[in-house]
């Protein structure tokens, strides 16, 4: 019993530490990819680009960030549970679909997505809501993998929503710590509810 507890603590510490490092790293690398994509369309990264370009930029930025974090998550989870590599594209897809839906809504409302970003001086609450929406989709998509083996795996949707939504509120460095702690604790709890 002590070995299981020690293994869970080790998992939680590693999961949280890696999230703390990788969320900001992914955000920084994604920023440069987004900047390059914006420049390829003939714009800077300070807003002002058309809604389509803005949506593409944020999707590219998010793709880099979610690919990095979900790859490491998958590697760690695969050591504890049987988990498909689809964990990675489902995370990326959730973020892209979320940003695309937000991009379309903002375009219809004549609001520039780039103006909402906290790094551009926009509302951190708006950024948190956008991240929470994408987190909901990420959780929903990843739930399809967890539900096959774990009772109450639907909690992952709520956990993902909260964890991703908190990232902008506590800035990305501490957002990674927050995401890692919340999702790590939740996964340990979900693992205890194995159905098969």
Where are these regions (language model features)?
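Juxtamembrane/disordered regions of integral membrane proteins
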Residues: 1-196
């Amino acid at each position: 019993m002590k070995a299981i507890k020690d293994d869970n603590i080790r998992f939680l510490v590693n999961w949280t530490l890696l999230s703390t490092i990788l969320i900001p790293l992914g955000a920084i690398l994604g920023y440069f990819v987004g900047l390059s994509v914006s420049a390829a369309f003939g714009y800077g990264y300070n807003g002002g680009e058309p809604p389509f370009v803005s949506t593409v930029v944020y999707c590219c930025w998010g793709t880099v960030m979610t690919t990095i974090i979900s790859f490491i998550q998958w590697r760690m989870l695969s050591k504890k549970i049987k988990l498909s590599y689809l964990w990675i594209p489902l995370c990326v897809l959730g973020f892209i679909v979320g940003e695309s839906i937000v991009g379309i809504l903002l375009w219809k409302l004549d609001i520039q997505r780039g103006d909402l970003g906290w790094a551009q001086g926009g509302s951190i609450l708006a950024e948190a809501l956008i991240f929470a929406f994408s987190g909901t989709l990420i959780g929903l998509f990843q739930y399809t993998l967890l539900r096959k083996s774990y009772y109450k795996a639907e909690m992952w949707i709520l956990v993902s929503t909260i964890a991703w939504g908190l990232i902008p509120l506590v800035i990305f460095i501490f957002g990674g710590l927050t995401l890692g702690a919340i999702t790590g604790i939740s996964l340990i709890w979900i693992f205890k509810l194995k159905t098969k």
